């Protein structure tokens, strides 16, 4: 039981009473925040999804008052992400690449069979109609080896005009993955490969 007003300086890195008491206060407050987020945000979100016969998807990581394993247990499908930077095929961009393995670990710990990922997200340097199946295959294979088994393409919503090419885009942030792309028809074999 803490006097919150008395312990507010602990949030700025100051010691209140003693280092031990300050550490215990910060641990308890962070644990409480994590529990509240897991139950009242992610748990409630999943309950609302189920009430409407929907499945909850979530990326259970990044900065916030939460604990990844705990919130991942409150959702139906854990989702990681990986970005499609053509040069990153040969580099280890662990900032975004590690999330697939994290999501797979959370899913497997909770007995969930599906591990999804926001896949091939474009970056300003690479999302200039430069993506193509051969350039993306190695990255996808690496993510499959980390536990991915459901691709969720990071792309724009629609192409309303049937003959406009190349059509609408998300600007620099999404993969250009739709029927207006010049490689769409020849890429059927790759589509079948990643859908297996």
PLM features: residue spans?
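Carbohydrate-binding surfaces of carbohydrate-active enzymes
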Residues: 1-78, 83-196
């Amino acid at each position: 039981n803490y006097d919150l007003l008395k312990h507010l300086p602990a949030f700025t890195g100051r010691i209140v009473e003693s280092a031990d008491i300050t550490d215990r206060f910060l641990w308890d407050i962070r644990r409480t925040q994590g529990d509240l987020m897991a139950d009242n945000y992610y748990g409630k979100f999943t309950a609302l999804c189920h009430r409407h016969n929907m499945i909850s998807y979530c990326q259970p990581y990044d900065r916030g008052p939460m604990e990844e394993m705990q919130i991942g247990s409150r959702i139906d499908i854990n989702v990681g992400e990986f970005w499609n930077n053509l040069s990153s095929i040969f580099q280890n961009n662990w900032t975004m690449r590690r999330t697939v393995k994290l999501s797979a670990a959370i899913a497997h710990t909770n007995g969930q069979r599906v591990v999804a990922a926001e896949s091939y997200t474009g970056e300003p340097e690479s999302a200039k109609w430069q993506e193509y199946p051969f350039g993306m295959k190695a990255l996808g294979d690496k993510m499959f080896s980390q536990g991915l088994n459901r691709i969720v393409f990071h792309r724009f919503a629609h192409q309303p005009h049937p003959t406009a090419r190349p059509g609408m885009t998300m600007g620099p942030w999404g993969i250009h993955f739709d029927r207006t792309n010049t490689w769409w028809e020849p890429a059927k074999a790759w589509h079948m490969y990643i859908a297996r």
